[in-house]
Amino acid sequence: MEFPDHSRHLLQCLSEQRHQGFLCDSTVLVGDAQFRAHRAVLASCSMYFHLFYKDQLDKRDIVHLNSDIVTAPAFALLLEFMYEGKLQFKSLPVEDVLAAASYLHMYDIVKVCKKKLKQKATAEADSTKREEDTSSCSDKVESFSEGGSTGRPATADLLQSDDEDMENKRDSPQEPGSMWMRLPSDRTTSPTTSPREAETHGPDAGKSPAGSPSSSSGSLSRRSAASRRVSADTDCVLDLSVKSSLGGGPGENIAGNPYFCSSVTPDSLQSALVQVKVEKDTGSDDDELVSGDYEMEHSGVKEPPSTNGTHLSLVAQRRLGLEAHLSALREASLASELERDDKGGDDDTDVLGGDSDRVQEAAGVESSLLPYVSSMLGAPHTQIFMCPLCNKVFPSPHILQIHLSTHFREQEGVRAKPAGDVNVPTCSICGKTFSCMYTLKRHERTHSGEKPYTCTTCGKSFQYSHNLSRHAVVHTREKPHACKWCERRFTQSGDLYRHIRKFHCELVNSLSVKSEALNLPTVRDWALEDSSQELWK
């Protein structure tokens, strides 16, 4: 006759005895904290205590645990699990519980902690993505809300507003370093005018009919200034999706204004123009040479016409700027190659080590553009595609958008890093950062060569505790791994696995071992399919 509740009743009695201090024959010290417990329970739930009490049982009344790896709250939680069979993290960090469970070789708890950390990382990534999508959409809606909130089309408001402003703009010189950028729209513009064709329009080209983008840009740029101050992220303005550089319907006509290379329709006016100031570094020669106003469409960046007959001088300045930028790209490419050659490997993985991959990716994109930029220097009328953030030029709008995406990935990487006031475990030798002190301590042994775990029987030292546990079985001659078919026992789990493949492979069609079964010191369950389960009947 079996009593199903007997095991539960036994655990309850042992837990009550531990709280009362009755028959507790062991004291565990974690820093200044003391924990009274029963040796039998500790040795049954932890391989660390099993090996500890196996050697000189009568002299092992007090156990000292490394407080740098095992914290008192984490051990209290694991001790409660040993006596009650329940694991409640409460407000305790999962990383601390994982470090303590790994130190004590409680592999079931290690598996649960790793799964919980994986779920937490996935949930944080999903929430971050949703927040970015929501903020991007809200900023775009806010930039267009004033034009459509009055119940009439945005074009009607733009037609009335800025005829007078455009007259003042045409008479006064524009600010150097400004750039026109079109917000994402459902239509694809068609680049039909070139700098040479823009010159043929002459001084009258500055006059544009009412309702053109040039007459509406001043009002909309002022309206969008407030939303740009609130949203400091540039990815709310730029369209990073790779679109075809050719497009436009048959009903579109070429605009007479040389500043804009696409026609004006009510639909296209909804993708309004926003003026973005390109911040220039005063100490950069490239930024001083490549000055002026540029208009960025989906097709690229074009140079505005010159009403003073100085177009040839601007072309010469542009060529000089391209040459200077080409030399800078070559130096950056050479430096990145030297860094990759000198970079050494390390087995430990840096938790926050994603930035180096992004920098190498950006350097690879720029170095691959060297032949294209060289060919652009030889063509006097070649269109240039300039980045509004760093003033770098590219041979096509597609590569420009890929380059822009690297800027935003760098911004996201900075946001992902912890704040400066957070004390992050950092290696003092190589500067790597880690999630908890346990992983930092393990990493520091790779630099110092320290082997703190010593076998009491033969004196051999090991870098990690699990290697000592595996070695200790050799001296005890214990064989914890048993075959369920022939009852032969083995010291190491690998020997058992090879034995099953050699002698029992014909009897068992397929065999799947539970995860971590090969790492545990006790006999684990084997999951068999229907054909193999017949052996038990």
From Swiss-Prot:
Residues 122-143 have a biased composition (Basic and acidic residues). One of its GO terms (molecular function) is DNA-binding transcription factor activity, RNA polymerase II-specific. It comes from the Eukaryota. InterPro entries: BTB/POZ_dom, SKP1/BTB/POZ_sf, Znf_C2H2_sf, Znf_C2H2_type. Keywords: DNA-binding, Metal-binding, Nucleus, Repeat, Repressor, Transcription, Transcription regulation, Zinc, Zinc-finger. Signal peptide: none annotated. Transcriptional repressor that plays a role in various developmental processes. Specifically binds the consensus DNA sequence 5'-[AC]ACATCTG[GT][AC]-3' which contains the E box core, and acts by recruiting chromatin remodeling multiprotein complexes. Belongs to the krueppel C2H2-type zinc-finger protein family. ZBTB18 subfamily. GO terms for biological process: regulation of transcription by RNA polymerase II. It is found in: Nucleus. Residues 24-91 form the BTB domain. PROSITE patterns: BTB (PS50097), ZINC_FINGER_C2H2_1 (PS00028), ZINC_FINGER_C2H2_2 (PS50157). This is Zinc finger and BTB domain-containing protein 18. A zinc finger (C2H2-type) spans 385-407, 425-447, 453-475, 481-504. Residues 182-195, 208-229 have a biased composition (Low complexity). One of its GO terms (cellular component) is nucleus. Its main location: nucleus. Residues 122-232, 335-355 are annotated as: Disordered.
